[in-house]
Amino acid sequence: MAQTLYDKLWNSHVVHTEEDGTALLYIDRQLLHEVTSPQAFEGLKLAQRPVWRISANLAVSDHNVPTTDRSHGIADPVSKLQVDTLDANCDAYGITQFKMNDVRQGIVHIIGPEQGATLPGMTIVCGDSHTSTHGAFGALAHGIGTSEVEHVLATQTLLQKKSKNMLVKVEGQLPRGCTAKDIVLAIIGRIGTAGGTGYAIEFGGSTIRALTMEGRMTVCNMAIEAGARAGMVAVDDTTVEYLKGRPFVPTGAEWDQAVEYWKTFRSDEGAQFDRVVELDAAQIVPQVTWGTSPEMVTSIDGRVPDPEREKDPVKRDAMERALAYMALAPNTPIEAIKVDKIFIGSCTNARIEDIRAAAYVVKKLNRRVAPNVRLAMVVPGSGLVKAQAEREGLDKVFTEAGFEWREPGCSMCLAMNADRLEPGERCASTSNRNFEGRQGQGGRTHLVSPAMAAAAAIEGHFVDIRRLG
């Protein structure tokens, strides 16, 4: 019987299935960070349990680390406690960890693939919503809660119910100026933030196959914003080439065997999906969110929608509340929206290709950050990304134009560290969530691609980067 990619990943990891369909799944890799792991380790200590498979875990601090000068340490006592606690727990249990001043440190969903710890055919979990990122490698990856983090540490398994299969098929050539971020925002705009609820989404079609691994990671990263349990892309030569030579991958004869195995992780011809959604890539234009949910998105050449035209009273009410919070008037051209701050970073868009795309726009415009922009910051996703960008001179492109070049971390994606918006500030952000208060109490977030964020920094408002050529 023909199987989907998700079916293959699920079936190859089932240890036992209960009568109600609940399955015990074997977990190949757990990624840990400082926010959702302390209680899990404390539970192990209280129960006097060991970590079942130490080598299956990889840890890093990312949410609370400062992105400015780290020689002064972490100022906030709660943040410092969380980072110190992860350090102590990893030392006590012998878990591999990249500490704050290690060049390999970075955002957990960037360092996993970067190190080759994320591999095709794996089940991967982390106490973090955007674990779906790793599905780009033909893996089953999703976020879990703190009690589940403890369960995986203790047993290397997890109780789960199988999701339904959804295929999101994007065909055709992506227009100039459009990126993976625009693809996934367009998908969410089409199906909504509940469209993927109860599903695992496979992203397929010629447009997805043409993406680099970094682009695929951006798409899978935001599968959770469409309500899906997981997002994934079939393994192909692009996947294998990306992994070749990375620290955690097999070598020699084991590499050849692994590649042969990995390439089986694709949907069979004739495999049946419970839902299929199709998009024409040629119709996608640069996207900008206008509201307080990723589904509240439109094209750069569009306008802020008018709630009066929405027939559904629930949706109309949500639109009205969002516009009030965002301080936007209906029918305002998106290009007329001015911004106060720019954030280029996060597990969605802080890889080297993202940094290059933003730098290209800054060089093309050849001007400094607009006077009305109070802060424009670029936060690389890892120390290795930062070092690569600096070798290419990209840091100078940004700093000479008035941007701040920071140390790696989650930064302004969420208001959990020193990088945040003040009440009423408006930010063009390359992150994944634009909820109320996500980047700081009263902060207003617009999700865009790195190129769009860079252009907004220079112009002081959103602009259509397709005009840049």
From Swiss-Prot:
CDD domains: IPMI (cd01583). GO terms for biological process: L-leucine biosynthetic process. Catalyzes the isomerization between 2-isopropylmalate and 3-isopropylmalate, via the formation of 2-isopropylmaleate. [4Fe-4S] cluster binds at C347, C410, C413. Keywords: 4Fe-4S, Amino-acid biosynthesis, Branched-chain amino acid biosynthesis, Iron, Iron-sulfur, Leucine biosynthesis, Lyase, Metal-binding. This is 3-isopropylmalate dehydratase large subunit. Its EC number is 4.2.1.33. It is an enzyme of class 4 (lyase). The gene is leuC. One of its GO terms (molecular function) is metal ion binding. It catalyses: (2R,3S)-3-isopropylmalate = (2S)-2-isopropylmalate. The keyword Hydrolase does not apply. Binds 1 [4Fe-4S] cluster per subunit. Its cofactor is [4Fe-4S] cluster. Pfam families: Aconitase (PF00330). Heterodimer of LeuC and LeuD. It comes from Burkholderia pseudomallei (strain K96243).
